[in-house]
């Protein structure tokens, strides 16, 4: 075409400007330096920052997890699904476990001195508050009076005081439950109060609405002081030494949050002083979130100062500094070359700093701007990318024309229909209607391994793909995290012991750099394992997505969606797990044929959602017809449990202990008939004066009956 063109990366473009205007340009730091600096600060340096240490301990103890309002969910089960994977182990448990040197604690073991896990974020706040202030307590200690088993939430052992936390609003309502369930909940609350009154035991109460107004801990302190409880706060340094320094994973979740926070703040050109003011200007009526942001800043700002000092001492700048400096140089000194057109590829990954650099160049050259990208595939927020610069394009560039390329050649139309419906559940994604000439029934297949046979299921899945398509094809194994392959290679039980190693025996060679995986019996099949982030832009004949479980480090990863990060975006995203949703869309669309989803029993929120669509197949022992949903929480599964004391079998919810619904009639699993009146019990055979009939398991609260003749 005879056009003079120059192709470059943002990295090279920015550094070229710095080299042109500066005689001795600084070197660019290794991208791992930030992570190393944060880790070093949290391990050692923080001990020399009293205010940072105090805020960090308080943040980790009471503010790391956000107690969302119950009415933000359609059911208790939806809330439990979203919160699943949160570490509900108390600080007291972590402290004494590290003191004793033993951490072999079953995750579901409750009410023990070491291994103590509570049932909600608010209970965790209360337990940690009591421990930090030296108030001895027992969690769910059996109440010593009365005929029926009753376990109040907390018992203050030195003061003979009981404490209950009720999930009600200011009007004494539990609107997050169904009408019948709310009535039961409120009735039980009154019964508990009456029991304490009858036996003249002291009961203190806290409520969920306290936390909404960020007065939970203040109210708790006030009540305890009025009741004569003496506070003897533990040393923050002692807490830190016993818990954080002794447990390498305890602070791991916060490192990722701080990394994203620093990258985004630097990309926006916010220095330490500017960040403090920015956060103050962002305050809302939500006092809990305001306090949370303040605590976070108290220890994040010293880390930023430390990181900048390390860069300065090494004579280096990081990528964000480089782009910001280049933009400032263009603004102050002008441009080195005039452009007629600036074309940006992969525009969905643009950051505030990169956009500022391009804007400075455009304003001085009059260049037309052409941006090519797909907002459905914006997955690099942790490096500073800001999707709103794409989705709100006109707001930032003014008059523009938008063109859609909606013809695709990789995926079948059936897979496009599923993946497009999934990604557009986020209303902030641009609406598109992609089309393909390829047709393929059931492009999504589910396989359901349990904790003992994930390796076997993966091998069987590969066998099926080879049997249907031959050995000369490319199979891509995808994981949300790099350790997802380890999950299927080395199966472990709840205590972490290796219980199956089948796939490891099959692995003849694995190249971590390229992802190439050679399995015995499949030597001629091109198999690779990579993370979903690394798969962007790639494709394969068939794709298997591993380890799709609902967990903190599952898919979605629940640590990437923190509101502190959203504040630094040009337009915060309201959709829960928005970036993780885009990442899952990328995973679904890498295949030219089928995508196979390996979903354990505790399956991903995303795979549950896709099962509400059409064009998929389910294989494996967890077929939908075999499962009975818990009518109380809506999303748990009813399973047979056994009373550890009596040995008697009963039916309980898979969400236990967070959903404690249970039934004595195990026959409801073979023929479940949901009670049409209360819709939380089941109809079972009963004997009456006139013979057999069907009655509700919630009797006497629900008196619905049905004659067997009907």
Positions of predicted regions on the chain:
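Conserved helicase NTPase motor core
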Residues: 1, 6, 88-102, 111-112, ...
């Amino acid at each position: 075409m005879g056009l003079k063109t120059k192709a470059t990366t943002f990295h090279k473009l920015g550094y070229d400007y710095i080299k042109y205007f500066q005689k001795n340009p600084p070197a660019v730091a290794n991208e791992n330096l930030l992570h190393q600096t944060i880790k070093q600060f949290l391990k050692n340096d923080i001990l020399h920052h009293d205010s940072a240490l105090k805020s960090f301990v308080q943040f980790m103890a009471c503010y790391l997890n956000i107690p969302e309002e119950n009415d933000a969910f359609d059911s208790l089960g939806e809330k439990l699904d979203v919160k699943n994977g949160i570490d509900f182990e108390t600080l007291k448990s972590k402290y004494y476990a590290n003191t004793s040197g033993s951490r072999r604690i079953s995750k579901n073991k409750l009410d023990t001195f070491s291994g103590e896990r509570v049932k909600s974020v608010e209970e965790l706040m209360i337990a940690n508050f009591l421990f930090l202030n030296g108030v001895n307590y027992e969690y769910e200690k059996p109440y010593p009076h009365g005929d029926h088993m009753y376990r109040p939430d907390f018992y203050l052992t030195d003061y003979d005081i009981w404490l209950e936390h009720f999930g009600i609003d200011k009007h004494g309502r539990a609107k997050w439950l169904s009408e019948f369930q709310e009535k039961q909940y409120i009735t039980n609350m009154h019964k508990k109060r009456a029991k304490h009154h009858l036996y003249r035991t002291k009961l203190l109460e806290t409520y969920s609405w306290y936390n909404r107004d960020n007065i939970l801990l203040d109210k708790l302190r006030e009540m305890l002081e009025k009741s004569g409880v003496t506070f003897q706060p533990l040393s923050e340094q002692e807490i830190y030494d016993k818990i954080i320094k002794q447990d390498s994973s305890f602070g791991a979740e916060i490192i990722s949050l701080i990394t994203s926070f620093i990258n985004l703040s630097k990309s926006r050109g916010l220095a330490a002083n500017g960040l403090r003011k920015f956060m103050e200007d962002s305050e809302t009526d939500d006092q809990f979130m305001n306090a949370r942001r303040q605590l976070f800043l108290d220890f994040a700002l010293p880390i930023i100062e430390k990181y900048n000092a390390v860069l300065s001492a090494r004579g280096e700048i990081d990528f964000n500094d480089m782009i910001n400096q280049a933009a400032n140089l263009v603004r102050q000194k002008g441009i080195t070359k005039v452009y007629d057109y600036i074309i940006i590829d992969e525009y969905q990954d643009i950051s505030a700093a990169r956009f500022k650099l391009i804007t400075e160049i455009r304003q001085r050259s009059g260049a037309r701007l052409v941006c090519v990208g797909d907002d459905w595939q914006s997955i690099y927020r942790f490096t500073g990318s800001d999707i709103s610069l794409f989705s709100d394009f006109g707001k930032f560039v003014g008059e523009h024309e938008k063109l859609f390329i909606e013809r695709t050649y990789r995926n079948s139309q059936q897979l496009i229909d599923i993946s497009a419906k999934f990604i557009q559940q986020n209303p902030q994604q641009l609406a598109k209607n992609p089309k393909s000439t390829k047709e393929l029934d059931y492009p999504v297949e589910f396989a359901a391994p349990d904790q003992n046979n994930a390796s076997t299921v993966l091998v069987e899945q590969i066998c099926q793909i080879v049997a249907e398509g031959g050995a000369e094809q490319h199979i891509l194994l995808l994981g949300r995290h790099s350790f997802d392959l380890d999950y299927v290679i080395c199966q472990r039980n709840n205590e972490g012991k290796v219980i199956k190693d089948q796939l490891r025996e099959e692995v003849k060679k694995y190249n971590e750099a390229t992802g190439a995986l050679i399995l015995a019996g499949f030597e001629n099949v091109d198999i690779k394992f990579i993370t979903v982030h690394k798969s962007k832009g790639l494709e394969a004949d068939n794709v298997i997505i591993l380890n799709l479980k609902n967990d903190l480090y599952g898919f979605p990863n629940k640590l990437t969606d923190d509101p502190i990060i959203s504040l630094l975006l040009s337009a915060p995203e309201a959709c829960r797990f928005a970036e993780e949703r885009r990442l899952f869309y990328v995973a679904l669309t890498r295949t030219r044929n089928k995508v196979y989803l390996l979903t354990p029993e505790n399956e991903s929120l995303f795979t549950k959602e896709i099962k509400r669509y059409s064009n998929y197949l389910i294989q494996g022992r967890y077929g939908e017809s075999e499962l009975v949903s818990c009518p109380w929480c809506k999303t748990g599964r009813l399973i047979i449990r056994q009373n550890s004391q009596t040995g008697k079998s009963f039916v309980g919810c898979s969400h236990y202990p967070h959903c404690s619904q249970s039934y004595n009639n195990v026959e409801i699993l073979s023929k479940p008939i949901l009670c049409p009146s209360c819709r939380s019990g089941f109809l079972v055979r009963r004997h009456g004066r006139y013979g057999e009939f069907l009655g509700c398991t919630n009797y006497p609260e629900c008196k619905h009956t049905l004659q067997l003749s009907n």
